[in-house]
């Protein structure tokens, strides 16, 4: 007795039409918060807002430039503001033209940029928080210094770092899903 097989997939009357020589290319999925989406734009403006608040707080303190860690925080916040504003403009362009960033080369640029700015922001926030703890707890010289403002600037930098790290993770996930 001969065994017969029954196909699991029923035949299609007309085969699908391919444009080009091979099967269709694999498309990247749009995750909420990925570049070129409304969530991505919200993340960019969140990064920009927190870093701008941190920058304004630090610049409003008269003697911040005498401490290297505070100067580094200001430099990283300037860099974070520029990066977030530029990518926010790209997100606005993508939303207005109804395009998305599905090119792996462009997404990898976002991934590397978010990774670098995230690392710099975290380092600046940690350095500023460490010096603030030193001034407040160890030296007990918080009276003449502006510890509350230093703490607020470091907290805003940490919030900016959180948004940048989330953006990095989503962009990295988008990049990994296309391969």
UniProtKB/Swiss-Prot annotation:
It is a multi-pass membrane protein. It holds the Pfam family CASP_dom. Residues 136-154 are extracellular. It is found in: Cell membrane. Residues 1-54, 97-114, 176-179 are cytoplasmic. Keywords: Cell membrane, Membrane, Transmembrane, Transmembrane helix. InterPro entries: CASP_dom, CASPL-5. One of its GO terms (cellular component) is plasma membrane. Its main location: membrane. The chain crosses the membrane at residues 55-75, 76-96, 115-135, 155-175. Belongs to the Casparian strip membrane proteins (CASP) family. Homodimer and heterodimers. PANTHER family: CASP-LIKE PROTEIN 5A1, CASP-LIKE PROTEIN 5B3. This is CASP-like protein 5A2. It comes from Physcomitrium patens (Spreading-leaved earth moss).
């Amino acid at each position: 007795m001969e065994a017969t097989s029954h196909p699991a997939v029923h035949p299609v009357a007309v085969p699908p039409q391919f444009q080009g020589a091979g099967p269709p290319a694999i498309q990247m999925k749009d995750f909420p918060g990925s570049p070129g989406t409304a969530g991505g734009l919200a993340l960019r403006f969140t990064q920009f807002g927190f870093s701008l608040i941190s920058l304004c707080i630090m610049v409003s303190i008269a003697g911040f430039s005498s401490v290297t860690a505070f100067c580094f925080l200001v430099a990283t916040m300037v860099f974070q503001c520029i990066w977030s504003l530029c990518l926010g403009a790209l997100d606005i362009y993508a939303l207005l033209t109804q395009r998305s960033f599905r090119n792996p080369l462009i997404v990898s640029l976002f991934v590397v940029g978010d990774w670098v700015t995230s690392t710099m922001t975290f380092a600046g926030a940690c350095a500023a928080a460490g010096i603030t703890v030193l001034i407040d707890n160890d030296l007990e010289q918080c009276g003449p210094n502006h510890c509350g403002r230093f703490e607020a600037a470091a907290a805003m930098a940490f919030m900016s770092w959180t948004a940048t790290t989330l953006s990095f993770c989503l962009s990295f996930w988008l990049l990994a899903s296309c391969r």
